[in-house]
Each structure stands twice: as structure tokens, then as C-alpha cells.
Amino acid sequence: MKQHTFSCAFLALCLLSACNSGPVEQNPTYEQNVASMKAMFDGFQNKSIDPSLFAEDFVDVGTGFEEVDRNKADAMQQWKMMTRVMDAELTNAVYLPGIDTLTLSLDGSVRYYGQWKMTMGEATQSLMAYGSMEFNEAGEIRNFAHYADWTATFGALLAENPEIAARLEQRANRSAQ
């Protein structure tokens, strides 16, 4: 009987010590970086992205098929074109801390999962997306990688808006000359 009592007491002690482990220490820049990510998305939704959120050596990582990386100027131009021809709204967004892939420690980077509702003319498409941003010591966004089928979604919106597609094609042809 004493053996059983001792075993129960030992088990209870183990459970208490396991439950008493301290909270996971958050990277002190994480909350500031989440605010920067949200500000970038707010700017996209309001059609006015603040370039000061981004480092001068910013890279928008090309994650699509044969998509090249874009620097800050090219990314700002791309986003300006997109916000000119469509409205976007991020819903059901979840923000999570990222980790250093070598040390597996929290590094201040931010991941997000969400659904983008994109509207062009009368057409609307919804798109599930995942993305990750890394930041420099000044708190500026250093890189942004996002994963979703943006090309198919944009193509579906253009298919329902042939007049916008024609204008974009004319602009592309003028730029190529």
C-alpha cells in the first residue's frame, strides 16, 4: 500500500512540475513586427502602401512558377498596379511568431494565414494564403514570401473583366516598346 501511495505522490509531483514550466519567451520585437505586417496589409486594402515599412534592400520573394524576386521599387510598382485594378480584403487572418530555421528559436519574424477576398468590377474571388515576413534590426520588412495561387485568381478576375484585361495588355505593350 505504501508503494502505491508513493507512486501516486511521485506521479502527482511530475504532473505539477510539468504544468509549472514557465511561459515561452517571446521575441521582444514580435509585436512591433506584427503591427508592421498589419500596416502593410491595411495599406494594400486602402490602396496606399507605406514604402517606409520596407528596408531599402527589401525582397518580395517570387514563390510562383518561374516568378522572379522583386526589389522594393518593383514590388511597390506591382502592388500599385494591383490595387489600381482591384479591391482586396484580408479576412480570418491569424498571425504567428516565426523561428530561426537553424536555431529554432523565436526570431521576430511573423507568419500569417488568411483569406483574401479580391474584387474587380462585379467579380469576386476568394483565396487562401500563407505568408512570412522577416525584419531587420530597425524593424523594417526585409523580405516577404507569400504562398497562394495569385496568378489563377487574378486570371479569373480578368476573365470576368475583359475591358480591364484589355487596358492592362495595352499598358504592357507600351512598356515593351
Model region roles, listed by residue range:
Residues 1-8:
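Bacterial N-terminal signal peptides that target proteins for export
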Residues 127-142:
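A short, surface-exposed beta-strand/turn
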Residues 19-43, 168-177:
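Short, low-complexity N-terminal intrinsically disordered segments enriched in polar/charged residues
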Residues 14-18:
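C-terminal motif of bacterial Sec signal peptides marking the signal peptidase cleavage site
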Residues 144-177:
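Low-complexity, intrinsically disordered terminal/linker segments enriched in charged
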Residues 111-113, 124-131:
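Short, surface-exposed coil-to-beta transition loops
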Residues 67, 117-126:
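Short, cysteine-centered beta-strand-loop-beta hairpins and adjacent loop/turn segments enriched
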Residues 48-108:
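A solvent-exposed, acidic/Ser-Thr-rich amphipathic alpha-helical stretch
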